[in-house]
Amino acid sequence: MKLNKYITGGIAVMAAAMLITSCTGEFDKWNTDHNSATEEDMTHDNLNTGAFFAQMEHNVFIVGLDKGGAFQIEDMLTGGLFSGYFSNIKASYDVGALHNAHYLLPDKWVNQPFGDTYTNLMQPWLSLKINAEKAETPSVTALANVVKVLGMSRLTDMYGPIPYTRFGTGINIAYDAQEEVYKAFFTELDDAISVLTEYYTASPSSKLLANFDYVFGGDVESWIRFANTLRLRLALRVVYADAALARTEAQKSFDSTIGFLEKAAIHSNGSKYSYLNPFWEVTQSWGDMRMGATIDSYLNGYSDPRAKAFFAEAVSGGGIHGVYPGLRINNQSAYTNSTSAINVARNSPMQWMSGAESFFLRAEAKLRWDMGEGTVQSLYESGIKASFAEEGVSGADSYIADSQRVPAEFKDNSGNRRDAAAVSTITVAWDEAAAFEEKLERIITQKYLAIFPDGQEAWSEYRRTGYPKQFAIDYNASSGVVSSDPGIRRLRFPANEYSNNADNVRAAVTLLGGADNGDTKLWWDKNPRH
């Protein structure tokens, strides 16, 4: 695999090109190729907004043909590693043998999520916004804003402060503090939900951008449910930084007349564009990554029926087996057949959000604030049942009732004997008499399993709550900068930004409240016990 072909520029360079695009209407290299369509052609069938909307959808979780390298860097080698979902087994990349897996963050890998997100998500959003305003279609802008908030929430949760509210206003773009970014998210979601609810109420059967929407096929009710669930996710994210804001935004979600997501949001593999599942490409075609030790411990300890839905059995000897995090790999072949790849096919669709997540979010809101209908236990158990249903496995009732099984000791199946004692004793069965923290650990642990393989979200939740408890990495190459326990907290700002947007990125460092390194906590990362 050649990662060196995925090279991005800084926000300043991209912004300069963006201004040219915005003024002239030309389509630069980052825009979808419309086969030289004229401006008039693109007004037909919403092409001048729909094409940009599809491009945005394709780049929240990167999908398409020949996208595995970008996806690997931006997802699996960041949140995928840091959440414990995956471990690296490749001996060396073009950045060397030590990298994110060892908390040594290569410039190239740190640059890429930042540059790609602005190029492939924010620029199409801006083009769509301009065209939608010309066409006076606020409902289309509302849809795009929901996708934008989803994508940019992932970015800010990697870095902290980011250029956001001023995007499109100049060449050298100032950063917003993460607190301000989140407040902008809430405002945008409020507005989007209001506009879409009005549209849906007036015409429940009407669809928006149906020919370009690969997630819900233009179904407006589903988009409202998704946006409302996303708002609750983000509200809970900030609970340790601003409890009042968290509660206010959560209550808005419960006050919605439409409700929450009930089934998974899935980006389809479609027939309108070239598609290859990047998880399959990275783990099965290239063989670079395998199951992580943390999720191994929980799935095997609980004898979880979802294990074989999530991961393929090891070629040698069967069973579901992970790899300890942060190993220095000398012999990739020792792990290739003895450990488990993710269980996806070449053309498997990409999950954006599990329907089960909405139940776990509501369970936590009920636990914290007694907010919404149902009990904490009923919502927690409904989340597990929804996850089992989504994965097509049986046995949810007996699994939920199990008060004996606990996370297992990690057993290294490669022959390298990197075993480790379990880091948690949390059981599955609900215990109403338990203290708050035990209840929270139970909820977040099951949410962690249900939202697999969304490593970025799992990493964010681990930083917020400390759950599920994880194994510390084996080899830390950060020279004491990043603590192995509790682990890495963020990516440092891209080197490209220091070259191309120096004054603004230096100002952004002051917003962090600490050094620009992987050990400094984000604004919302204020849990006193983690």
Where are these regions (language model features)?
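Beta-strand acidic-aromatic groove motif in beta-rich domains, primarily in extracellular
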Residues: 65-75, 161, 247, 455-460
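Structured, solvent-exposed acidic/aromatic patches
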Residues: 43-47, 89-398, 432-441, 446
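Membrane-proximal, proline-rich intrinsically disordered regions
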Residues: 23-84, 468, 480-530
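Sec-dependent bacterial lipoprotein signal peptides
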Residues: 1-22
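C-terminal functional modules
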Residues: 395, 399-530
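Extracellular glycan-recognition regions
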Residues: 25-28, 111-113, 462, 467-469
